[in-house]
């Protein structure tokens, strides 16, 4: 493995020859060559775009979960307040309206 890494450093000037003979091995051993090879650049763009898409998808899920949690937490607070203070039922209604606005 060490000998091959030394060879890959000397083969930087011969990128085309290196891709035809050992394209996969260079991708695993030499990280610097990934930026030089156009194939690795395309793979990097795909992976980067995919990670960015995952971030957007997760953010949508998180916003949806946060909205659900707020709604559930408001219901729990309303139930607790109603059980604890039966006279102040109007306060629960105002809390409902506030939660719907958010």
Swiss-Prot record:
This is Protamine-2. Protamines substitute for histones in the chromatin of sperm during the haploid phase of spermatogenesis. They compact sperm DNA into a highly condensed, stable and inactive complex. Its main location: nucleus. Residues 49-102 have a biased composition (Basic residues). Interacts with TDRP. InterPro entries: PRM2 (IPR000492). The modification Phosphoserine is found at residues 8, 10. Residues 18-29 have a biased composition (Low complexity). It is found in: Nucleus; Chromosome. GO terms for molecular function: DNA binding. Proteolytic processing into mature chains is required for histone eviction during spermatogenesis. Transition proteins (TNP1 and TNP2) are required for processing. It comes from Macaca mulatta. Residues 8-17, 39-48 have a biased composition (Basic and acidic residues). The gene is PRM2. It holds the Pfam family Protamine_P2. GO terms for cellular component: nucleosome; nucleus.
């Amino acid at each position: 493995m060490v000998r091959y890494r030394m060879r890959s450093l000397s083969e930087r000037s011969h990128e085309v020859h290196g891709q035809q003979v050992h394209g996969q091995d260079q991708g695993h051993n030499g990280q610097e060559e990934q930026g030089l090879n156009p194939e690795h650049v395309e793979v990097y763009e795909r992976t980067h775009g995919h990670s960015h898409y995952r971030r957007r998808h997760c953010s949508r899920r998180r916003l949806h979960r946060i909205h659900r949690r707020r709604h559930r937490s408001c219901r729990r607070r309303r139930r607790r307040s109603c059980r604890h203070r039966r006279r102040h039922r109007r306060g629960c209604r105002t809390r409902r309206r506030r939660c719907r606005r958010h």
